[in-house]
């Protein structure tokens, strides 16, 4: 029996509708709108595409949205000055620096310079620490999207065996921290696999919920999945192009095999990806309320 598709695009649309109502209420009752600035250094085509998608969503929701494009040779100190300006701007509640940055700029130094209360990506060590102790102001966007997708699909997370393949600071580590907390949509037992894990399949076959963020196309095969498991495929890998030049994308899970074993699975594209930008918008609305002391 083919698995149910967990279509993040549809869930993200529902959440955006909720956020739009919230933004309208912020404006009508309190006279404020969420403000988001996206800083793009250079002309990386993929980064330009991501920034465009974020800006389009922000406009759709009625945000005060600023796109600050800077040349690839921008000096690091100039970028720090820009961030300082937005840190002090009361109309801006969220600051997003699009990564990767040019090699001459120290990414860690840049991310550390963002006011943690405006760090809507939740990358700042202050926000990572708050997540660790279970008191986050903002949740990292892709893990938050995964958790929201699990909750809204009715997946039983509490008490579940969850295996995460990948230990990145953006997905693997934070989703492990989130799902182990004493909280709704959490209370799971977590295993994290990585490049030094021996016999990854022995861990993935135990998982009631399998989250794969390995960065390798079709790394997890159907025979590595527990029958009836819920599979969250975070990977987006370009494996070629069609005759008319369109990208061919594959996830980190061999979809055609997995769909015959799992009870539910996210497609690629259209699964986790759309949730990430939507959760960024949710964090920005939250930041607006925090800065304006709105409960």
Swiss-Prot record:
Stated EC number for the protein is 1.5.1.5, 3.5.4.9
Q: Pathway involvement?
A: One-carbon metabolism; tetrahydrofolate interconversion
The UniProt annotation places NADP(+) binding at 166-168, 195, 236
Gene Ontology terms describing biological process: L-histidine biosynthetic process; methionine biosynthetic process; purine nucleotide biosynthetic process; tetrahydrofolate interconversion
Entry's Gene Ontology molecular function annotations? methenyltetrahydrofolate cyclohydrolase activity; methylenetetrahydrofolate dehydrogenase (NADP+) activity
**Which keywords does this chain's UniProt record carry?**
Amino-acid biosynthesis, Histidine biosynthesis, Hydrolase, Methionine biosynthesis, Multifunctional enzyme, NADP, One-carbon metabolism, Oxidoreductase, Purine biosynthesis
Is the keyword NADP assigned to this protein? yes
The protein's matches in CDD domains, at most eight in alphabetical order, are given as:
NAD_bind_m-THF_DH_Cyclohyd (cd01080)
Claim: Oxidoreductase is one of the keywords in the record: yes
Matching entries from SUPFAM superfamilies are given as: Aminoacid dehydrogenase-like, N-terminal domain, NAD(P)-binding Rossmann-fold domains
Quote the catalytic activity from the record.
Answer: (6R)-5,10-methylene-5,6,7,8-tetrahydrofolate + NADP(+) = (6R)-5,10-methenyltetrahydrofolate + NADPH; (6R)-5,10-methenyltetrahydrofolate + H2O = (6R)-10-formyltetrahydrofolate + H(+)
Q: Which GO terms describe its cellular component?
A: cytosol
Q: How does it assemble?
A: Homodimer.
Role this protein plays:
Catalyzes the oxidation of 5,10-methylenetetrahydrofolate to 5,10-methenyltetrahydrofolate and then the hydrolysis of 5,10-methenyltetrahydrofolate to 10-formyltetrahydrofolate.
Family label: Belongs to the tetrahydrofolate dehydrogenase/cyclohydrolase family.
Q: In its UniProt entry, what is this protein called? A: Bifunctional protein FolD
Task: Please name the source species.
Answer: Syntrophobacter fumaroxidans (strain DSM 10017 / MPOB)
């Amino acid at each position: 029996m083919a698995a149910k598709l967990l279509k993040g695009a549809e869930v993200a649309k529902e959440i955006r509708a909720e956020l739009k109502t919230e933004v309208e209420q912020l404006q009508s009752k309190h006279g404020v709108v969420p403000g988001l600035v996206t800083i793009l250094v250079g002309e990386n085509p993929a980064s330009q595409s991501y920034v465009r998608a974020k800006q389009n969503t922000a406009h759709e929701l009625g945000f005060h949205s600023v796109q600050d494009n800077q040349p690839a040779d921008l000096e690091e100190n100039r970028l720090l000055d820009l961030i300082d300006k937005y840190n002090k701007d009361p109309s801006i509640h969220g600051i997003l620096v699009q990564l990767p940055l040019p090699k001459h700029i120290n990414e860690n130094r840049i991310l550390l310079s963002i006011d943690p209360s405006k760090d809507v990506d939740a990358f700042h060590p202050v926000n990572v620490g708050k997540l660790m102790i279970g008191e986050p102001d903002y949740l990292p966007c892709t893990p938050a999207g995964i958790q929201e997708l699990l909750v809204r699909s009715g997946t039983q997370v509490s008490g579940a065996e969850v295996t995460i393949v990948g230990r990145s600071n953006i997905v693997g580590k934070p989703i492990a921290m989130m799902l182990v907390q004493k909280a709704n949509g959490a209370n799971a037992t977590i295993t994290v696999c990585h490049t030094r894990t021996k016999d990854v399949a022995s861990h993935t076959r135990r998982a009631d919920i399998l989250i794969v963020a390995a960065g390798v196309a079709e790394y997890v095969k159907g025979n590595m999945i527990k029958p009836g498991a819920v599979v969250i495929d975070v990977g987006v890998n370009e494996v070629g192009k069609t005759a008319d030049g369109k990208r061919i994308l594959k996830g980190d899970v061999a979809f055609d095999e997995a769909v015959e074993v799992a009870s539910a699975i996210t497609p690629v594209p259209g699964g986790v990806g759309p949730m990430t930008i939507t959760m960024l918008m949710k964090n920005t609305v939250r930041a607006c309320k925090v800065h304006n002391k709105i409960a």
